[in-house]
Amino acid sequence: MSGTLVLVRHGQSEWNLKNLFTGWRDPDLTELGVEEAKAGGAALAEYGIKFDIAFTSVLVRAQRTCQMVLDAVGQSSLETICDQALNERDYGDLSGLNKDDARAKWGEEQVHIWRRSYDVPPPGGESLRDTGARVWPYYLTEILPRVLAGEKVLVAAHGNSLRSLVMVLDRLTKEQVLNLNLATGVPMVYKLKADSTVASKEVLGDMSAAH
């Protein structure tokens, strides 16, 4: 019997709003981010799911999103595991910089490569491949066994840590994942087969609103 895996990207953060590279820095949600998280929770409540466990990162924007989703589905006290393996991609020396200022310092082409290549990290930071190298093993050892045991599992995390998971779940190429944008607060509901491949996927919201 296979279970259900729900992935949710955190709501808009204060640094998303200011156009800053965030990474492992820890800004809170904006008012819009709170509304996005609540809307994602409301969509899951309407869907009718009840979770067995939740996973999130050690960063407050993901943790608050996770809690708001659980509040919305009536499971405020559900066991939640926080682990830095699910943290956002580490942007290294870019962390805290305005994206326009970074382009002025390093050049638009170089910053674009750091942001959108699969395996070229910014100085002192991680590439998307590096991010996946910590996210995927954690998924395989801690999350997937619960789903395969029939549990309903919530993962509230970040744009790039979730892209690393979606890349494998949806069987995307390196080129395809670079063009993948995940909207804040929009749940993705995966039903998995016994062999851990995807049986079905539903998006509960407008993924075209990604930023």
From Swiss-Prot:
The gene is gpmA. It comes from Sinorhizobium fredii (strain NBRC 101917 / NGR234). It is an enzyme of class 5 (isomerase). Disulfide bonds: none annotated. Its EC number is 5.4.2.11. This is 2,3-bisphosphoglycerate-dependent phosphoglycerate mutase. It catalyses: (2R)-2-phosphoglycerate = (2R)-3-phosphoglycerate. Keywords: Gluconeogenesis, Glycolysis, Isomerase. Substrate binds at residues 9-16, 22-23, 61, 88-91, 99, 115-116, 159-160. The keyword Isomerase applies. One of its GO terms (molecular function) is phosphoglycerate mutase activity. Homodimer. The active site is at H10, E88.
